[in-house]
Amino acid sequence: MAYPVVNAPYGLKPINLIGGQVFAGSTREYAIPYGYATNIFYGDIVGLTRGNVQRLSVSTGTLGTVTGVFLGCSYTNPTTKQKQFAQYWPASTLAGDAVAIVCDDPDTVFKAVVCSATTVVASGARAMIGQNLAMINNTGNVNTGDSANALLAPSDTPATTDALPVRVLGLVPDTVVTLGSATYTSISTATVTCSALPFALPVGTDVGSLAANGQYIPSGSFVDTAASAGATSFILNQAPVTAFASSSTLVFAQYPELLVKLNFGQHQYYAATSIA
């Protein structure tokens, strides 16, 4: 069975709620300022200023100012004078009745793409679950109307600071890419030597090994620096939890998407201080 290929980030896509709550896909409408001069794309994070929606930069967090995620808008087209429903808000549109459709439930679980830089798709890993991640504030696509914001693949140990915008809840198995395997040779601190890799390893690649009985052993680590096909070594973010056995088979998987939630204190509904 062919699974979908993830070629680019798309911002935050709501899929569920935490705690087994019923997810109805409900949204709330907020006004967009007349002539608001910034594009807002489907999947962008937004906040409120004086009752109006504003697009937020999300790189390292926006403590207490997040209202939700933009999921389209409607407005009267100033040229045709017809009501228009759109995937994104075109900057500087002169419409006085513009409203944004926003997923504002602070318990929403989102799906998002992991990138190493700009829109370069990288990987998530099991070791990232429970950690906080920064995001990459990319410019969206006016042709599709979709956001291009992405999760930033961490280097070394994922950060724990509460200033970062999202918490990783899980992996998305539907789009995992099983890259293949290599034979383990040795390790020095976190640099692993192995047989020549027949494939490239993106940042964040999940690494495990096979036990003598055929069981899979998660390493609790991920690839820290991208490695090219043909390389005979790669660097982990940390030494594996369980040491690799001599000449064991190393297994590599790329998870381009992760499940995340807006961090506590980022969403204005979970912050006691009101917006300005």
Q: How should each PLM-predicted stretch be described?
A:
Residues M1-L179, T183, A190, G208-S221, ...:
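Surface-exposed, low-hydrophobicity beta-strand/loop segments enriched in small/polar/acidic residues
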Residues Y184-S195, A226-I235:
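Ser/Thr- and Asn-enriched, surface-exposed coil loops between beta-strands
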Residues P198-A200:
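Disulfide-braced loops of extracellular cysteine-rich modules
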